[in-house]
Amino acid sequence: MPIDTVMETLPGYAKDIKLNYSTLVRQNTELTPQQLWGTVVASAIATRNDTLTAAALEDGAQHLSEQALEAARIAAALMSMNNIFYRFQHLSSNEKYATMPARLRMNGMRTHGVEPVDFELWSLAVSAINGCGKCVDSHEKVLREKGAGEDLVLAAVRVASVIHAIGAVLDAEKVHQPEAAMA
């Protein structure tokens, strides 16, 4: 089921979310199609909502190459690990943790096969969803060093915020209407 169909199932209280999604997708001027749909896919995966993730992957396959779709998945997977690890370092009052090696494999960050700016945008979007300030700062810095402007960065975060909200509404509706969730 495409995301547009999922959007039709959102209740009235999510009207702003629906309108924001429509505007972001149909009137996007800042992001390339690959940047937009990679951000949608990576962000949907980060919400952990099955319905939204399946819809985003379906739509993503229409707009992204297989390699870009896989790279968006890589960004979501690696950030789900890194965001926890580096958020812990950031939040812990024990400064020693920040000096210790991560010892976590992250080869996908180098071997994803898409434009580095695109992959960084997707990583930034997932990091914003997962609330890792250290990761947000790191990815934003790399993006700026690669020539990305604040408008591009904020456009990706805007997409992430709306996708996250869609996932939250879908989860709330599962709880509100358990019989629908079982179908």
Curated annotation (Swiss-Prot):
One of its GO terms (biological process) is response to oxidative stress. It holds the Pfam family CMD. Disulfide bonds join 132-135. GO terms for molecular function: alkyl hydroperoxide reductase activity; disulfide oxidoreductase activity; hydroperoxide reductase activity; peroxiredoxin activity. Antioxidant protein with alkyl hydroperoxidase activity. Required for the reduction of the AhpC active site cysteine residues and for the regeneration of the AhpC enzyme activity. Belongs to the AhpD family. This is Alkyl hydroperoxide reductase AhpD. It comes from Acidobacterium capsulatum (strain ATCC 51196 / DSM 11244 / BCRC 80197 / JCM 7670 / NBRC 15755 / NCIMB 13165 / 161). The lineage of its organism: Bacteria, Pseudomonadati, Acidobacteriota, Terriglobia, Terriglobales.
